[in-house]
Amino acid sequence: IFISLTPYQYTYLNKLNGDFATSYNRFENDYLATSIKELIRKIPNNTNIITNNKKIKISFCGAPHNLSRRELDKLKNFDYEVMDLYEGNYDYVIMTNRALADRDENTLKNVKSCFDKIKGEDIIKVERNGLMLSTLRKKL
């Protein structure tokens, strides 16, 4: 099982944690966000958002902005604008399952992962053994 996670071995959880594919509800699995590079590299081959000849409004949740921007800038003919996640005026979100609290509340009662908080359609995913590590999600 360890080899099948390559290069994300640090996401390994043993069988005592239950079903590996649903552990995103209990842990921040890709806490280093290394799957973001793989996710962004899939955009030209797995979507048609580059061929629409329009600027894409994109936001990030749990994904480091500098890493995400650097990888997005490598895509040919990909015109994008980074939008504020909390304002909600984006078309797509690049995300991991990092915990996300409400901006205005300093409590733990409303903390959810990015996967749970941001609704939409997963366009591209990076998965290992059924566990989603990161996704490009289209806003509903």
Label each region the model flagged.
Residues 1-135:
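Catalytic lumenal/periplasmic loop and adjoining terminal transmembrane helix
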Residues 136-140:
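Short beta-strand-to-coil "C-cap" segments at the C-terminal boundary of structured domains/repeats
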